[in-house]
UniProtKB/Swiss-Prot annotation:
To yeast YER158C. The modification Phosphoserine is found at S472, S526. It comes from Saccharomyces cerevisiae (strain ATCC 204508 / S288c). Acts in conjunction with the alpha-factor receptor to promote morphogenesis and adaptation. Residues 1-12 have a biased composition (Polar residues). This is Protein AFR1.
């Protein structure tokens, strides 16, 4: 994979005061041979020549003089915000210095022996969609649906504090300067192996890097030859795209970086190799400036962030209001609760990292959101009313279930207490309760329930009332003969009927009123004789069909009139009684006594099969 191109404007004029005073101008572009590694191209030459042509700049044989790169290299168009554009442009800016002689000559008298060439280039490539999204997520923005995204501020600049890993091919070391305007002395000269030091002065804004300075001491008496093995050390920007170093031969993603070209300097051995190490001081990088404007923006950002977090907490207002109502026992507790909320929502200033460009957009979004939500007030009373009704319904259901089980147990206990003893006496406890509740009994209700006695029939002592349509037989023998005699004569009731023995005309006349045909079965004739028991006759197949019979078969059963049904008036009275109990709860005491009596009857007096007693229903 080929490396990225370096674009520059060839026809851009160089300021006169930045041109070094030299007798020869042919060595102004004597640069490192590492340019051939980067495949540096010129836009002007690229336009009129073949697009595949790559213009290389090789180093010359003569003395190396200072060269100052042009300001504001052209930036490839990409989808980025204005704040990110300004940060990237800051890397292409060359910090002007008063002197090229290590800061000691202030009258702009250039000395040809010690002149410091400064090179600052931006190596970049078109960002991938993943990189664009990642750079976008580093600052706050607003979604199309109105929601505001803001990155989490944990109070630590993890990207700037991360120590860059030095590649095996990178031998250059870095140092972030701690004082403004500090320069390297003449004694600190890059060693013979090609190492160099990048000097990054602090900027005025206090959060990024505006310029980078490359300080190398090159004696004029010795020709500076550029080492072909000099590596390229990349420093990532502190505020955006914090990735590892990029190399042209690697397949890593190219980001906006700053390239320092390392020159091989031939010096005396007495100077030694002085290498300044990387300073990872957290206090210096995150030290707030004394600028009043920056302090105001920081304070405004903190307030905006606090309001934004308060707005997010308002989504939990409904549940919080319910909890407040439960916890609100006194005025002091309410005051303490408010203090706790204030402490919980307070954000320490040390945990905030201000970005002047990125936070300006976030401040505008937060201020706009605060202006829209200032006049909104939440009605806690309505929320509490709705919540209370829900809780009341849930509690009432639970109470009903509990009361149902409790009442069932009480009924069984009362029935056990009111059970008669062997002497037929009622327990003393039940008698005492009856005396206490005697004054609460409503006579009208008792009268309504007294009608039940008319429909209660004791089936143990007497049979149900005899139906008028039931045939009357004198004795069991005649009844047996009546049910066993059968005839195949199907005659009309209008014609004469051959009656069997012991069947009177009066019974036949009664049956005519209900049925058209009357069949008499004589089981004595149908029974097989004992002499034919040994003879086996093959069974004849019986044809099964469905038909509507016009005859009746008499059997020992009861007629429909023998079973009395409930009176509709009683059902209406029962519904009216239940409605009165619901309207007047005071009637419950009298009703409970009646229910207790009915339940006692069901348990002790009502005749129930032994296997069906477990299915008995009691009134509750």
């Amino acid at each position: 994979m080929e490396g990225s191109y370096l674009s520059a404007q060839e026809n851009q004029p160089i300021p006169e005061r930045l041109i070094p005073r030299s007798n020869s101008t042919s060595n102004l572009f004597a640069l490192s041979s590492t340019f051939s590694k980067l495949n540096v191209r010129n836009d002007a030459d690229y336009n009129y020549s073949n697009p595949n042509k790559k213009r290389h700049i090789y180093s010359g044989e003569i003395d190396c003089r200072s060269v100052t790169a042009a300001r504001k290299f052209p930036v490839r168009s990409c989808s980025m915000t204005a704040a990110q554009q300004r940060k990237r442009t800051a890397l292409f800016t060359v910090r002007e210095r008063n002197s090229y002689h290590e800061g000691f000559n202030n009258d702009q008298d250039y000395v040809s022996q010690y002149q410091k060439p400064q090179y600052t280039f931006g190596v970049y490539k078109e960002l991938t969609p993943y990189q664009l999204q990642r750079s976008k997520m580093k600052r706050s923005f607003q979604f199309p649906n109105g929601e505001i995204y803001k990155p989490k501020l944990d109070g630590k600049c993890t990207h700037s504090l991360k120590k860059p890993e030095l590649n095996s091919r990178d031998s250059s070391l870095f140092k972030f300067s701690e004082k403004k305007g500090r320069n390297l002395s003449k004694d600190f000269v890059g060693p013979h192996n090609g190492t160099s030091v990048i000097h990054i002065p602090p900027n005025d804004t206090g959060y990024g890097v505006n310029s980078l300075e490359l300080n190398t001491s090159v004696p004029s008496t010795i020709k500076s030859s550029v080492s072909s093995t000099s590596p390229i050390s990349a420093v990532n920007t502190l505020t955006s795209l914090p990735e590892s170093q990029t190399d042209d031969d690697d397949g890593y993603e190219n980001k906006t970086v700053t390239i320092s070209y390392c020159f091989e300097n031939t010096v005396n051995e007495k100077h030694g190799s002085h290498i300044e190490k990387l300073d990872l001081s957290t206090k210096e990088k995150t030290k707030p400036t004394t600028n009043s404007g920056l302090f105001d923006r920081k304070k405004k950002t903190i307030l905006g962030t606090e309001k934004y977090r308060c707005i997010k907490s308002q989504s939990k207002l409904k549940l919080g209001s319910v909890l407040k109502k439960l916890w609100r026992t006194s005025g002091n507790s309410n005051t303490k609760h408010g203090k706790k909320d204030t402490k919980r929502r307070r954000i320490p200033i040390d945990d905030m990292v201000t970005h002047s460009d990125g936070n300006s957009e976030a401040e505008n979004d937060i201020e706009l959101m605060d202006a829209n939500l200032d006049g909104i007030e939440f009605d806690d009373d309505e929320t509490l009313m709705d919540t209370d009704s829900i809780f009341d319904d849930l509690l009432s259901k639970e109470n009903d279930k509990y009361d149902l089980r409790r009442r069932q147990l009480e009924i069984r206990q009362k029935l056990h207490e009111t059970s008669h003893n062997d002497d037929g006496k009622v327990s003393f406890r039940d008698t005492e309760k009856h005396n206490v509740n005697e004054g609460l009994i409503d006579k009208t209700i008792i009268e309504e329930f007294s009608k039940l006695g008319e429909y209660i029939i004791d089936t143990r002592n007497q049979p149900p009332p005899r139906s008028s349509k039931r045939p009357s037989l004198d004795d069991n023998e005649s009844a047996r003969y009546f049910y066993n005699i059968s005839t195949d004569l199907r005659q009309s009731l209008s014609g004469p009927i051959s009656l069997p023995m012991h069947v009177g005309n009066d019974m036949v006349n009664r049956l005519r009123n209900d049925w058209e045909y009357i069949r008499f079965e004589d089981r004595r004739n149908s029974l097989p004789d004992s002499s034919f028991d040994k003879v086996e006759t093959p069974p004849k197949p019986i044809k099964k069909d469905v038909r509507f019979a016009k005859e009746v078969c008499l059997a020992s059963t009861w007629s429909s009139n023998a079973y009395e049904r409930a009176n509709p008036e009683f059902i209406m009275n029962r519904h009216r009684l239940l409605w009165m109990m619901k309207v007047h709860p005071s009637m419950n005491s009298a009703m409970n006594e009646i229910k207790l009596e009915l339940n006692s009857y069901k348990k002790n007096e009502m005749v129930v099969h032994e296997n069906s007693k477990c299915f008995t229903h009691y009134l509750i």
